[in-house]
Amino acid sequence: MSHRYIPLTEKDKQEMLQTIGAKSIGELFGDVPSDILLNRDLNIAEGEAETTLLRRLNRIASKNITKETHTSFLGAGVYDHYAPSVVDAMISRSEFYTAYTPYQPEISQGELQAIFEFQTLICELTDMDVANSSMYDGMTSFAEACILAFSQTKKNKIVVSKGLHYQALQVLHTYAKTRKEFEVVEIDLDGTVTDLKKLEAAVDDETAAVAVQYPNFYGSIEDLEKIHSFIEDKKALFIVYANPLALGLLTPPGSFGADIVVGDTQPFGIPAQFGGPHCGYFATTKKLMRKVPGRLVGQTQDDEGNRGFVLTLQAREQHIRRDKATSNICSNQALNALASSIAMSALGKQGIYDIAVQNIEHANYAKQQFIKKGFEVLDGTSFNEFVVKFDKPIQQVNEELVKYNIIGGFDLGVVSDDFKNHMLIAVTELRTKDEIDTFVEKAGELND
């Protein structure tokens, strides 16, 4: 190039045309019919000075509603949590700043160790034997868990609670469409928890797995011990989609006999933003280790006895055994997994426990305030979400709340007509008493 920073100067163009034997750009495109050529300049504005452009873009961006400008009570799978400042500082290091595991992985011992630590932290939270290096998001992890269950048990039916996130169920049904022999049976709710009688009746010897969410989509905590008792003698797998932050306080699924625990680590160090990215986790037992999708990092020793890390059990993966792979997914969210690892490490076991307790306390306070205001709050032991019934459409209420710089809860009417005019409200450790009181007060005024 004739200029170090500006490509395609007139001199560059002439040199390229001369090299290929064309006299002009018009001659270069001479084979294109003239009636479809645009014989004028594009109708776009001239370039702007950087300062002018930044001012204009900032004006446009200021129209956005964000958790920095508004108080958010929106959850439904994506939550407004505290992320330690060290997270962004660490993941911005050039050694880490990529979403991919390297294709010559053993060269990058630091990155492999970081992934190994993520796997270890997930195992500790879930009380499981092994975890993979991450997946795209929790819903992908859930669908892959169901596919593993079909493969392991050689059965064709999976029983799932309607208390699972509705989009997780949509992903599962998308997977099932490509496997016509698979049957997905959805179990109704009893209030905001799974109807255990219907669940027990649906589980039979043809059931590959039973899947529930913990806490479930409606914020209620399912009875994992009782659910597991229904499937013990059916040789079906027990899949639990769990909020990892809640596991800092709740008894982990592994202690209830779960075979696979999946979820999304977004509550740890990953900002709430429309469309992601997220970070799915996938944890299971040693028995199912060789069927786990995605990458696994293992600890080993080199010839000199030094600790080292490797990608292990790679024969499971589609880049090794494409026709017999346990999954078509090898990519992962290594950068977000690192962010979650840093957040968990910075908080520590006690810190995660403390934040989980704050979520429960703040949510319960908000519940009581709504009840005092005369709202119907649906029954259920909850973590940081609960359901409130309104007299008016939720969309209308939320549109009005925005005027008071409040982002309201999720409109459950989108999911089911049974929950028309019901709002799913998330109250995390970041919400203050004043913010909760203001939200309840304005919601009461708008509901009159």
Swiss-Prot record:
Disulfide bonds: none annotated. Its EC number is 1.4.4.2. GO terms for molecular function: glycine dehydrogenase (decarboxylating) activity. Keywords: Oxidoreductase. CDD domains: GDC-P (cd00613). GO terms for biological process: glycine decarboxylation via glycine cleavage system; nucleoside metabolic process. The keyword Oxidoreductase applies. The glycine cleavage system is composed of four proteins: P, T, L and H. In this organism, the P 'protein' is a heterodimer of two subunits. This is Probable glycine dehydrogenase (decarboxylating) subunit 1. The keyword Transferase does not apply. It comes from Staphylococcus aureus (strain NCTC 8325 / PS 47). It catalyses: N(6)-[(R)-lipoyl]-L-lysyl-[glycine-cleavage complex H protein] + glycine + H(+) = N(6)-[(R)-S(8)-aminomethyldihydrolipoyl]-L-lysyl-[glycine-cleavage complex H protein] + CO2. Pfam families: GDC-P. The glycine cleavage system catalyzes the degradation of glycine. The P protein binds the alpha-amino group of glycine through its pyridoxal phosphate cofactor; CO(2) is released and the remaining methylamine moiety is then transferred to the lipoamide cofactor of the H protein. Belongs to the GcvP family. N-terminal subunit subfamily. SUPFAM superfamilies: PLP-dependent transferases (SSF53383).
